[in-house]
Amino acid sequence: MKILKLFLPIAVSISSLFATWFDDIPRTITQPNGEIIDCFVTGDQYGRRLHDANDFTMIMNPEDGYYYYAIPGINNELIPSTFIPGTVDPKTYGLEPGLAMSLAEYNRNKDFYHNSESERDSRDAPTSGEIAQINVFIRFADDPVFPNPRSYYDVVFQADEGEPSLRDYYWEVSYNSLWVNTFHFPGSIDDVNTAYQDEHPRGYYQPQSGTNPDGYQNDNERTQREHTLLANALNAISSEVSPLTDIDANDDGYVDAVSFVIYGQPGDWAELLWPHRWSLYSQTVTINGAQVWDYLFMLSESWYFNVGVLCHEFFHVLGAPDLYHYDGGGSPSPVGGWDV
């Protein structure tokens, strides 16, 4: 069956900010001295961890910006040890593999996003007919231009008929009753993937540390920066959206579907630079009279930018919940091959 090509073992949890769970995704981090460390990331938007091939967790020390192997703190929170990955064998020093964020901390992160939204967090887009999705490309002040043409990024949204894409997936699983058209902004000339360029560098949207003094310091500051970024991008392209495009098919006063593709790769630990769905509750942005609320947030230059992740996040736009329960340990148990 063609649909099964798109199912990925991605797990998730019920909340107002919907997340995407990944296991053992290869990552490369650079220490302040320039040393490169090949590692993996496991987790989701609420909490994730970097770890080596033997599952020993690594964490940044915000004082010097270096990554160290993690150890349990007094209250079982993860804190950096004095052992730098690549310089010691963690087994020799009795370190414990598989250390993860505590369930209490994970739930605190989840509750923050849930409690910060209003009653509109339960609104859903239409599940039949046609949906016009607005997608905005964004790069930061210190980013290069997107390396691939617009047609390359468009494929995951709406490939040719019969090929895996967001549009094809929902057309098939809805028994030919839901058709999703995606309109990309800013407009493209000669297939160049133009993007809204923000005034701040990438580090502004990452946690503060000894090597990133201008980063955000807490969840409230992170929220303000993310929402301001997206509001500015939307205001910059809003005049390009044709009034003939029906972006509010169910006439509830809200844009049915909005997504953002941010240049670069996802961040580490609980950074905002991670695929997620949220709502623009702290800003008031309208396009042709409809307010922007729900949105999808994607990163462009990595394995994460694929049909499976996009389809997973879009299910939340339609009102579907996440399908796993984090227990403070290893990988959660999703619903197997039926999850996307």
Give the positions of each predicted feature.
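A generic structural micro-environment signature
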Residues: 7, 35, 43, 144-146
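N-terminal prosegments of processed precursors
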Residues: 19-123
